[in-house]
Amino acid sequence: MKKIILSVAALAAITVTGQQKDSLQVKDVDEVVLTASRKKESIKEVPSSVTIVSQKQIQSQLTVNSDITNILQYTVPSLATSSGMTTNSGQTLRGRQVLVLIDGIPQSTPLRNGSRDIRSIDPSVIERIEVIKGATSIYGNGSDGGIINYITKKSNGEKTISGQSQVGITGQLYEGTLGVRASQFLTGKITPKFDYAVSLAYERTGYMKDADGVSLSPTSSPAKMDNYNGMLKLGYNLNGNQRIEASYIGYASKSDLNLGLKTGKYGMTPTIGEGSAKNQETTPQGTPRNHNFKLSYDNRNLWKGTALNINLYLQDFRTVYGYSDTFLNGGQSNVISKKKGARFNFDTQLWNTQNSQGEVIYGADILNDQTVQKLEDGRYWTPDMDMTNIAPFMLVKIDLFKKLILKGGLRYENIKVKVGDFNTLSTIKNDGTFTKSIFVKGGDLEYNALVGNIGFRYNFNPQINLFGSFSQSYSINELGRILRTSTAETINQLETKPIIVNNYELGATGQITKWLNYEITSYVSTSKLGATFVQSPDRSLMIQRAPEVVYGVEGFLQFTPARWINFGGSYSWMEGITSPKDDGDYSTKINNSRISAPKVLAYIQVRPIRGLSVGLDMLHAFGQNRFQPNAKTGSYTYGEGRVPEYTVFNFKSSYEINKSWRVAGGIENLLNRSYQPAIAWWAARDSDFVNALGTRGTLMVEYRF
């Protein structure tokens, strides 16, 4: 372990990388972060690496592709590349699963990871995205790789009504590819104390085709899909210190893609869409509902030196997958998750002197998560899982001489999961026969653990800010997957222990001159038990539970030599190793479904005349050749396929006609590069070997009032 930490530190010392202004994160010294400590604080007070994707960046990326998974792959180093489909399978953060939030409401379904949590909101309603990288327990279950928090737009201004209207079209140079999107945002104050914000968005996509004009695979395809998003926020200021706010955010997607599937050959011929489908699906693919309700109360002066924040929330999520003959008699599966939660957050000032100040943030989180995976015909694929999590926490923060920030915290996880009795599904084996269904007796599972974090940030001067931290996460990840493949007759015989991740991070950031910003970060994360998909001898997927180590580096450079131009980029690299027999031998690598290839993001943005902005983004994914194929068959197993490198350029531009009107346009895959996304290669399956989207254009018109 010491050798690993030293090697990562050495690599970080010689790695200088880049970060973009419109496509990547730019850290302003006064930038505010909400997610890191569950309160507003300057980014200069955070002892770890944070990526903030601003509203300006989101709007810029919208002119290229409105899929939030695509936006994030171009803006977040160490986040794996997008699949280009409705699933975010394989899109890990620093090699581990990420917890997705909308205004602090958990969207992820860690009890049975449906891989559709990142794509759970329309980007038009997002004000900013905060990405906390590395294991953390600050928001509870599921954040082994970090947190992605979508912070939605809020009421602003003193007008009774103001807003933003957008309409746009997308398409390729092929018949049937035309798509449309429209969004409307309204905000204002009805009275001096009562404010509101409301948003509606709709998008209809056309057919999606590769660089040769061939329809992409219909499996988990975003083509011919209706996407809906709505938001309503109502706020009332009781007085200068107290505020209550109620909000609803809803998202839904539904596909009517009637396209047949022509399965290709892995590494040779891509799987494509062709002809008409067999209409075996009884329910359209997509996410029929993602309802989020939240009621919050803020009191900035509950008593002397103490503030209080209370959040009560509900989430109702359902997503549906395509037809599969994996099951006996075939079928479509779904994931249903219903969450109820409360967060109680106190913030007490301990002291405040000229040279130091201290505060303690403390409270408790309560979460009930009911998750199940079934087939649309009613058969259970996982049992009903009912989790209750009660977690008190405390975080102490000390600021010395306005230069040194010290943080330390503890969180006690108390988790109980009720598992119902169930019969396992008969699924197809490699020889064409089906597994035998067995009855599994349910029961209660209970987990308890104390996890913590400690970190520092020393702001020497604008040129050098050092930070370092140790943090832990605690998660019950993929319990449903473990249960549904059970060969035991009772859950007590299964390996269902939680994952505790220890994350170590060391980095430096600063502004060398007024035109050059940088950041360098190295990290190591360890866990006694992981959860990785591996392929069994009959080619079915199973969860491997084994000790793991993931380590890597990332960094960025951002140049602004003149007011009319900026450029830069970022680089991220990681490696992961495991000990399958838990014997101290870490010569086995974690497969590519978790460990993504090194990634370079680069950009240039030019403003040649007033109101006009023109930019070019580049994503370069390096190749991966970490495993050898089977010596007899020449085939790779799942997650171990060789991944070739590829480079994609995107063009984007906008023109401010006046204070009210703006037009914008973008071209995705500018050079019409023919390539396959990483998942097509590392999955090593014929059905997953698909091409990526060819050149596609977007034109948008915006009106602000």
What are these regions (language model features)?
Residues 105-133, 182-184:
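Short acidic/polar hinge/loop motifs at secondary-structure boundaries
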Residues 121-164, 704:
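A beta-strand signature from Gram-negative outer-membrane beta-barrel systems
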Residues 175-205, 214-258, 289-291, 352, ...:
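Transmembrane beta-barrel wall of Gram-negative outer-membrane proteins
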Residues 205-209, 217, 221-227, 237, ...:
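Flexible loop and strand-edge segments within Gram-negative outer membrane beta-barrel domains
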Residues 307-325, 459, 465-477, 481, ...:
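Membrane-embedded beta-barrel scaffold of Gram-negative outer-membrane proteins
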Residues 474, 620-629, 654-705:
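C-terminal beta-signal and adjacent terminal beta-strands/loops
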Residues 519-526, 544-630, 671:
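Gram-negative outer-membrane beta-barrel transporters
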